[in-house]
Design a protein with these regions (language model features):
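Short alpha-helical transmembrane segments in multi-pass integral membrane proteins
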Residues: 1-21, 79-146, 188-244, 301-367, ...
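Transmembrane helical elements of multi-pass membrane transporters/channels
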Residues: 19-38, 140, 174, 203-207, ...
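Transmembrane alpha-helix boundary and packing residues in multipass membrane permease domains
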Residues: 24, 28, 40, 44, ...
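Small-residue-rich hydrophobic transmembrane alpha-helices
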Residues: 51-111, 148-167, 275-339, 371-393
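Helix-terminus/linker motif at the lipid-water interface of multi-pass membrane proteins
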Residues: 33-52, 121-128, 184-191, 251-281, ...
Length: 450
């Protein structure tokens, strides 16, 4: 049984569900790990100022790259629904449309990003040596935006194509490329922040461009193939609306990261930005589990909803909430013990910074108890084709509540208010998610098996 191929049309018990989503979780975890290696190399081989500069400018290309998540999640829901209806040719046509759109958008945004990078860096508060490092790093990443957007998009479509493990191996290839080149270019050849950026750029070629050739091959054994397509504005608009929650999530994360850095520069200076960078790298590992599960399980929900199998949608809904609850408790407890050791890898050369990071993370890490439910709620409604509800959760959770918390809590609690802001925002979003789970069931009927 363990070697039997798992298909979207299957009934999912806990074992089958976990095995199906594990490659997607692994993909997200590995992506986080090679991002961490980036930070480790810059911090230890170039220095604290360069590390702070990279973390200051990093949200900018990440913000622009969210287009890939929007087309990936919104488009895969449409493609999965179409496959559930049994129309393979139309699913391929839609898939090809979304891929072409992602590539064109990446080229346009790359040009705009290069033109606007310096004024944006100045607006973020970069100056002197930090500004120089930020621009040198950011310019290279702006060049690689087309492949970065494709890489983000394919994360969802590999699952819909019933090839989550292949998607994982593409990510492993990209990650190994990044890590090896980080050590070579930054640690051995001393190419400074440009070396780290070039390593990231070439890894995105592996993760974003090579899958194009796989899906172009008519002999590939997945459910999806790239083919001739045509512009269908209605379908593209629906994908954008449906994926707007993921766009909002990732867009908001970048905007909020920018706001965090701005506040921390005011309250703690360069050390605050460096501390936040370490916390972000560490939290990537925990957030990756929730995001990987949400992305991995969404195509199953889309397929069964498209096939009008409400009983299986209910089964997936119930099992997912239970799994997320157990994992959230385990990860939160575990994170409190490992953070001092993680921090030492990054900034072992600065004892005061180590103390700041350890205290800050123990406040920030409380959010892991709640976060998974909100991530899943947004993804679940996207999978059902309810992009408006999904976008509402994402907008409130990742933008409105976090902006309010990071601006208001420091007035009451000082710098501790900044570290507690994400937990407060997740708690407020959880109340919204619970309310929407209850009210939207009247339309989708996922809380009771039919």
């Amino acid at each position: 049984m363990s070697k039997q191929k798992i298909q979207l049309s299957d009934h999912f018990d806990y074992s089958r569900l976990i095995r199906f989503v594990l490659p997607c979780i692994g993909t997200m975890l590995f992506t986080s790990i090679y991002g961490i290696v980036d930070g480790l190399c810059v911090s230890n081989f170039v220095g604290k100022t360069a590390f702070a500069a990279v973390n200051l400018i990093m949200p900018v290309p990440m913000l622009v790259g969210t287009v890939g998540f929007m087309l990936g999640t919104g488009g895969s829901a449409i493609v999965g629904f179409t496959l559930g209806e049994g129309d393979k040719a139309r699913a391929d046509r839609y898939f090809s449309l979304f891929m072409s759109t992602a590539l064109i958008a990446g080229i346009v945004l790359s040009v705009l990003g290069m033109l606007l990078l310096r004024p944006v860096a100045l607006m973020l508060g970069a100056e002197g040596e930090m500004l120089d490092y930020a621009l040198r790093y950011g310019r290279v990443l702006m060049l690689s935006l087309p492949t970065f957007i494709l890489q983000n998009m394919f994360q969802s479509f590999f699952v819909t194509a019933e090839k989550p493990l292949l998607g994982f191996w593409f990510t492993v290839g990209a990650g190994c490329t990044n890590m090896v080149l980080d050590v070579l270019l930054v640690g051995i050849l001393h190419w400074s922040v440009e070396g780290a950026a070039i390593a990231t750029m070439l890894s995105q070629v592996v993760g974003g461009l090579l899958p194009v050739f796989y899906f172009l091959n008519r002999k590939n054994t997945s459910l999806l193939h790239l083919c001739r397509t045509q512009f269908e504005g209605g379908v593209l608009l629906k994908a954008c609306v449906n994926g707007s929650s993921e766009l909002m999530t990732n867009l908001s994360m970048s905007l909020v990261n920018i706001l965090y850095n701005y506040q921390l520069l005011r309250f703690a200076g360069e050390d605050g930005v460096a501390a936040y960078g370490v916390i972000m790298y560490a939290s990537f590992l925990f957030v990756a589990v929730f995001v990987g599960y949400a992305v991995g399980s969404a195509p199953i929900v889309s397929y069964h909803y498209g096939a009008n199998n409400r009983k299986e949608v209910n089964n997936l809904y119930r099992k997912s909430l239970k799994l997320i609850g157990v994992v959230a408790v385990v990860m939160t407890i575990g994170s409190m013990f490992i953070i001092p050791h993680v921090a030492r890898f990054f900034v072992g050369y600065d004892e005061n910074l180590l103390i700041l990071i350890t205290r800050a993370f123990r406040l920030y890490g409380l959010s892991f108890l709640i976060m998974g439910f909100n991530v899943y709620a947004s993804s679940f409604f996207t999978a059902l084709g309810d992009g408006v509800t999904s976008a509402l959760i994402s907008f409130l959770r990742t933008l409105l509540f976090q902006v309010a918390a990071v601006l208001l809590l420091p007035l009451l609690l000082g710098i501790d208010g900044i570290w507690l802001a994400v937990t407060a925002a997740e708690l407020a979003a959880l109340l919204v998610s619970i309310g929407l789970f209850i009210t939207r069931d009247q339309q989708f009927h996922y809380r009771k098996a039919e």
